[in-house]
């Protein structure tokens, strides 16, 4: 069999769902043709392969490229000053009253043009790519007006054009109530003006809603979901981060790809997610940065068979994190997730959370050839070490980059 590129003398984490766990192969090879994997598995069982190029991995580990399935990467401004203020005793309410918080990011993002937003976002993206990310979701939500939301989504698309990475755009117009507006009239605008325009331009694949007592109600979230489905967009939700608004249960009824945060999720929400196949996206960076104490119900989610994905939640206010490797360590340390769960959370289950499990997140024939090649002794090193980047090479669609 002819192939374009062959990686051999490697140890593999295939993340093959059928095999379960990490799907470890001790003496493995990965063969690629036209950007897709044609074989990934044991060298001893491989068909005869004639590669144009072969790479001796010298016993390095190969995993699927990492997938960050929840980010707010595109924004302008810097809120490090608020971090300092909180350390000195200021409350979130104090900061918001002084014009800070999400309003500060909205103000800066609205003021930035495409070029400025792109320049601000590229270093954050590059930091993720340097740790093996090959696909990431990027949400809007810092424009909170049609033209500015479109601008954010447009820049997200430009990021994907400028780097070898797949960008999955999500419309999060229902992130917060804009300054000077009221929630219901604004949600009406999201549903009747923003969603139709964004869907018509093909700028987003899904919608997201922040369903919380300080943002939007369950009824308002449902209004957004109905509008999204009418325009062919998939559904995600920020749910149960600060209180139990039963948002995850609602989203599951609408077939949501994922429910994210979910610290206050109850058993009814767990059952609804399990029945719908909705992925739990856990965000340990936000939990850490905000010094939260309410743990997501990991044991209940495991028992119910709900897939567990992880993400950085990169954003300027509650998780200024661009390191998936550190997020894995946080998930293990704070949430007591296993090594297998942490690595699967940034590969196989993250692909599921983005509706891409048919072609991303595993090493097997037919999948896109997105790889991360690691200088590690064992998979646990990816989760155990902190401030450590063992990436040897990143491969996107079969091309080293």
UniProtKB/Swiss-Prot annotation:
A GO cellular component entry from the record: cytoplasm
Binding site for N-formimidoyl-L-glutamate: 142, 315, 317
Entry keywords, A to Z: Cytoplasm, Histidine metabolism, Hydrolase, Iron, Metal-binding, Zinc
Catalytic activity: 4-imidazolone-5-propanoate + H2O = N-formimidoyl-L-glutamate
Cofactor binding annotation: Binds 1 zinc or iron ion per subunit.
Residues annotated for Zn(2+) binding in this entry: 70, 72, 238, 313
Pathway membership: Amino-acid degradation; L-histidine degradation into L-glutamate; N-formimidoyl-L-glutamate from L-histidine: step 3/3
Membrane-spanning segments: none
Single annotated GO MF: iron ion binding
Family annotation (InterPro entries): Amidohydro_3, HutI, Metal-dep_hydrolase_composite, Metal_Hydrolase
Chief place of localization: cytoplasm
Localization annotation: Cytoplasm
Biological process according to GO: L-histidine catabolic process to glutamate and formamide; L-histidine catabolic process to glutamate and formate
Disulfide pattern: none
PANTHER family on file: IMIDAZOLONEPROPIONASE, IMIDAZOLONEPROPIONASE-RELATED
Family: Belongs to the metallo-dependent hydrolases superfamily. HutI family.
Annotated function: Catalyzes the hydrolytic cleavage of the carbon-nitrogen bond in imidazolone-5-propanoate to yield N-formimidoyl-L-glutamate. It is the third step in the universal histidine degradation pathway.
Name of the protein described by the UniProt record: Imidazolonepropionase
Gene designation per UniProt: hutI
């Amino acid at each position: 069999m002819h192939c374009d590129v062959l990686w051999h003398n490697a140890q593999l984490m295939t993340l093959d769902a059928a095999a379960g766990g990490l799907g470890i192969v001790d003496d493995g090879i990965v063969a690629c043709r036209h950007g897709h994997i044609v074989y990934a598995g044991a060298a001893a069982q491989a068909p005869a392969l004639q590669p144009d190029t072969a790479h001796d991995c010298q016993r390095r580990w190969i995993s699927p490229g990492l997938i960050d399935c929840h980010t707010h990467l595109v924004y302008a401004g810097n809120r490090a000053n608020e971090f300092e203020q909180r350390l000195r005793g200021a409350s979130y309410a104090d900061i918001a009253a002084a014009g800070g918080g999400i309003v500060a990011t909205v103000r800066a993002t609205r003021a930035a043009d495409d070029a400025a937003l792109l320049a601000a976002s590229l270093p954050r993206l590059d930091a993720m790519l340097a740790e093996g990310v090959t696909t990431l979701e990027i949400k809007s939500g810092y424009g909170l007006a049609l033209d500015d939301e479109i601008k954010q989504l447009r820049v997200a698309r430009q990021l994907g054009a400028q780097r070898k990475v797949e960008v999955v755009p999500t419309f999060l117009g229902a992130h917060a109530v804009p300054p000077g507006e009221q929630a219901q009239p604004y949600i009406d605008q999201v549903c009747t003006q923003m969603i139709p325009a964004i869907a018509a331009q093909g700028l987003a694949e899904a919608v997201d809603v922040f369903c919380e007592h300080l943002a939007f109600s369950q009824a308002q979230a449902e209004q957004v979901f109905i509008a999204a489905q009418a325009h062919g967009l998939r559904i995600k939700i920020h749910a149960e981060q600060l209180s139990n608004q039963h948002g995850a249960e609602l989203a599951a009824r609408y077939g949501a790809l994922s429910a994210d945060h979910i610290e206050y999720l109850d058993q009814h929400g767990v059952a609804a997610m399990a029945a719908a196949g909705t992925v739990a996206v856990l965000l340990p960076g936000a939990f850490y940065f905000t010094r939260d104490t309410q743990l997501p119900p990991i044991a209940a989610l495991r028992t119910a068979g709900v897939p567990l994905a992880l993400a950085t939640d990169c954003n300027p206010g509650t998780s200024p994190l661009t390191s998936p490797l550190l997020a894995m360590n946080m998930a293990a340390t704070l949430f007591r997730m296993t090594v297998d769960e942490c690595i699967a959370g940034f590969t196989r289950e993250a692909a599921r959370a983005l509706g891409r499990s048919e072609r991303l997140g595993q090493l097997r024939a037919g999948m896109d050839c997105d790889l991360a090649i690691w200088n590690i002794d064992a998979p646990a090193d990816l989760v155990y070490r902190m401030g450590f980047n063992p990436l040897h090479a990143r491969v996107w669609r079969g091309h080293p980059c």
